[in-house]
Amino acid sequence: MAISTSSQANPEAVQTLINALNSGQLAQAESLAKALIAQHANTFILHHVLALALDGQHKFSEAVGSYQNALKLQSNMPDLQFNLGIALTQVNRLDEAANAYLQAIRLQPNFFEAHGNLGTILQRQGKLEEAIVSYQKGLKINPQDARGHFNLGTALRDNGDLPAAIKAYKTAIELFSNYTDAHNNLGETLRDFGDMAEAVKSYQAALALNASHANANYNMAEFLYLAKKYDEAIAYFERSQLDDWQARILYCLYKAENFAAFKTKLDAVSQQTRHTSPFIATLATHYAINFGVENNYNFCKNPFDFVYSTPIAELEQPNSALLKQLLDDINHADIAERVQGMLTNGKQSAGNLFKRPEASFRELAELIKQQFLAYKTKFSSADCELILSFPSELEFTSSWYVKMRQGGHLSPHIHEIGWLSGAVYLAMPTPKAGSNEGAFEYGTHGDNYPICNPQLRDQFATASVLPKVGDIVLFPSSLFHRTIPYQANADRICIAFDLKPAFRVASNNSDKNSY
């Protein structure tokens, strides 16, 4: 935006100030602007330049004040409202940022970047449908905006609309063929949609553009280890250096039965980092049982002691309105399915259920957060990282429903990207007397981990909980768990979720969106 001088201050002094800003001498521009403002407090240009200088130095809190001072003097400036929105976003004042973008749009309705940035704010606030509308408004103004299509794809994917997300990512790529993040995100969404062959092509396209792309390397590694190509997977994890890459390498070594290399790396990781990886805890526990050695990884050495089950009052009460609404939303809301190879006679939702707009899901999320706090209080005296490093911010890495029918079951697995995992039970089959059909079973073995001595199989203990409707079960994410098959002619419906670890910035999804 062009900057015009004001007669309220000496034109030569103002020009010197503008020259300092335009030449990148931001600290000097800041100093000059403050000195001039002390003498000419009502000169718009001085506050504007000061805001830009502060913004450029990442002094966002101060920049917010300067933008606001400038707007008090001249309020009909859409670019200034837009810049204010960006600065407010940087200091996490999201409601105010959204309002600034709305003001920019009011002043300039075709300001497509403001529509896009408003979408990112709404998405961060979990207002996915509003975010989608905002992105679409921006794209109606400028359909050639590749980044706008990318951001739309991230919101659609979060909202569980995988086909529409795939279309949005493909459009972004058509507009900008070298859009590495779009190729990678397209691959992730195709994977969730069950088209692994096309997903791999997308990862490879991303890596052809940027061989060091962390997410694409991670995703290729994940594909290779699922294909049991462990040595190839390790190389990609090494290149990714992303999130839990060291745990994934340990997994590959263990599944390949390269136990010597596994033990060497486990010891190194245990000595160099805090014991805050549930995934490594799973592997360390299995190795200790397998070889009859002590488990020194202190995430949660006795995970069976940390399984927690209790009813949620709002769901267990007779004729629960919340229970009825949750079941209605699961059965009738437009939520795409995610292909899940471990699930038999059932379906699993795609996207992040607790980010959806339905009030029932949001209410349940808040009730679950209360149970997280109750869990932490119950085990507050425990001397293990599960409790000592319990996340202070209660966020969900993921959330989804699982709906099974007669004969349904889920194979033993863990949630690698969780800290604390759990499920709330909304419908349960009636088991035969003395039977634990449909129960939640947990243990220390699963995923075809190698057992060196068949005589040790009984050392890998299991236990189970038979939940009632309205119950919540919480457990360390390091525990294997499964659903025991049931034969009753009834649905078994639960909503599962993971508490986000404090020590991981993000999952392996690269759904970064911004203008």
Task: Please place each PLM-identified region on the residue numbering.
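Conserved alpha-helical positions within TPR/SEL1-like repeat arrays
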Residues: 18, 22, 45-56, 79-90, ...
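Catalytic core of non-heme Fe(II) oxygenases with the double-stranded beta-helix
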Residues: 359, 366, 373-474, 484-485, ...
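Non-heme Fe(II)/2-oxoglutarate
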Residues: 296-388
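Residue-level recognition of tetratricopeptide repeat
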Residues: 43, 77, 111, 145, ...
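Structural marker of alpha-solenoid helical repeat scaffolds
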Residues: 39, 73, 107, 141, ...
